[in-house]
From Swiss-Prot:
This is Putative olfactory receptor 13C6. Its main location: membrane. It is found in: Cell membrane. Keywords: Cell membrane, G-protein coupled receptor, Glycoprotein, Membrane, Olfaction, Receptor, Sensory transduction, Transducer, Transmembrane, Transmembrane helix. It comes from Homo sapiens. GO terms for cellular component: plasma membrane. Glycans are attached at residue 5. The keyword NADP does not apply. Residues 1-27, 83-100 are extracellular. One of its GO terms (biological process) is detection of chemical stimulus involved in sensory perception of smell. It holds the Pfam family 7tm_4. Residues 49-61 are cytoplasmic. Belongs to the G-protein coupled receptor 1 family. GO terms for molecular function: G protein-coupled receptor activity; olfactory receptor activity.
Length: 151
């Protein structure tokens, strides 16, 4: 009697979602789509305002614009797949698509942590050392620290 070592590789995952309540999927699709459009519109307006208004070319607004861009990237990496899973009858995600989505989520989360720490430093300098703020957070000072962040 020969025992064979049988292994199966995982190629896709089954998304259960709201299988017990299929009528709610269309309602959730509309709600999530509306929230996604509000996110895109709100962050897009903030980015447009910080880029177009020369009075807002300061570190605080620069970081807020980058945070808005990062928020758009973060939601765009996951929401379209969620919306697609509500519409299609086959509710699966491939292993590679899952790995890419996980990587993007971790990368965006890490970038957001770095960006929020830079924003915290900016506000710390503005509140605790207001007279030194123009020197510490000059364009020559904050441009090199923003290079790891996108935008």
């Amino acid at each position: 009697m020969v025992s064979a070592n049988q292994t199966a590789s995982v190629t896709e995952f089954i998304l259960l979602g709201l299988s017990a309540h299929p009528k709610l999927e269309k309602t959730f699709f509309v709600l999530i789509l509306l929230m996604y459009l509000v996110i895109l519109l709100g962050n897009g307006v903030l980015i447009l305002m910080t880029v177009s208004n020369s009075h807002l070319h300061m570190p605080m607004y620069f970081f807020l614009g980058n945070l808005s861009f990062l928020d758009i990237c973060y939601t765009t990496s996951s929401v379209p797949l969620i919306l697609d899973s509500f519409l299609t009858p086959r509710k699966t995600i491939s292993f590679s698509a899952c790995a890419v989505q996980m990587f993007l989520s971790f990368a965006m989360g890490a970038t957001e942590c770095v960006l929020l720490s830079m924003m915290a430093f900016d506000r710390y300098v503005a509140i605790c050392n207001p007279l030194r703020y123009p020197v510490v957070m000059s364009k020559a000072a904050y441009m090199p620290i923003r290079l790891p962040a996108p935008g």
